[in-house]
Swiss-Prot record:
Entry binding sites for Cu cation A2: C126, E128, C130, H134
Record EC number: 7.1.1.9
The name this protein goes by in its record: Cytochrome c oxidase subunit 2
GO annotations of cellular component type: mitochondrial inner membrane
Domain of life (superkingdom): Eukaryota
The protein's enzyme class: translocase
Residues the record lists as binding Mg(2+): E128
Cofactor: Cu cation
Species classification: Eukaryota, Sar, Alveolata, Ciliophora, Intramacronucleata
Role this protein plays: Component of the cytochrome c oxidase, the last enzyme in the mitochondrial electron transport chain which drives oxidative phosphorylation. The respiratory chain contains 3 multisubunit complexes succinate dehydrogenase (complex II, CII), ubiquinol-cytochrome c oxidoreductase (cytochrome b-c1 complex, complex III, CIII) and cytochrome c oxidase (complex IV, CIV), that cooperate to transfer electrons derived from NADH and succinate to molecular oxygen, creating an electrochemical gradient over the inner membrane that drives transmembrane transport and the ATP synthase.
Gene Ontology MF term list: copper ion binding; cytochrome-c oxidase activity
Length: 181
């Protein structure tokens, strides 16, 4: 049985036409579907709202995926040398906005120099699945102007464990808590 559609030309907007289902659609017992009315503007608004909801959902999801417990704070307009090493697995520290990809190999120290000329927050991830829970290792980097960085430096200072020799090789990792936000 074909579905009959009744067009309502008495709509206030000139470019839209209301559509009312006047016959039984696919579900016979559903009175709500029988009495549905659509016009182009309300349909467009509905699509627009759903699109905004999906965009907001994806932004919220991406924020959750990039959330970190600590933030590395660095100054801008300064050459920064990063010395990295690993004890157990190969790591690949990747921040695409800065063009930085640093590979850490177990038992070796790698040196990388980079320069940040713009202030802001930068996000990255571990670029390789290199061990347990490394499929999602977010990185948050805060680049501050040099004057603001000096104020931050005076407030937080260097971690005490950087100046002491540690018998436990993993103790220095926990010493960086004060250095990061």
């Amino acid at each position: 049985m074909p579905l009959r559609v009744k067009l309502d030309k008495n709509d206030l907007s000139k470019n839209t036409a209301s559509v009312k289902f006047t016959d039984k659609p696919y579900l016979v017992a559903n009175k709500i579907i029988k009495s549905l009315e659509f016009n182009a503007t309300s349909l467009y608004r509905c699509i627009k709202k759903n699109k905004l909801r999906s965009e907001n959902f994806s932004v919220q999801l991406s924020r959750r995926l990039l959330r970190t417990k600590k933030t590395l704070v660095l100054p801008s307009h300064v050459n920064i040398t990063l010395i990295s090493n690993s004890y157990d697995v190969i790591l690949s520290w990747f921040i695409p906005a800065l063009g930085i990809k640093i590979d850490c190999v177990x038992g070796r120290a790698t040196h990388h120099t980079f320069y940040c000329d713009s202030v802001g927050f930068y996000y990255g991830q571990c670029a390789e699945i290199c061990g347990r829970y490394h499929h999602h290792m977010p990185i948050k980097l805060c680049i501050l102007p040099f004057e603001h960085f000096l104020i931050w430096w005076q407030h937080f200072g260097l971690p005490k464990l950087l100046f002491t020799e540690s018998k436990n090789r993993f103790e220095t990792d926990y010493g960086l808590k004060k250095f990061c936000w």
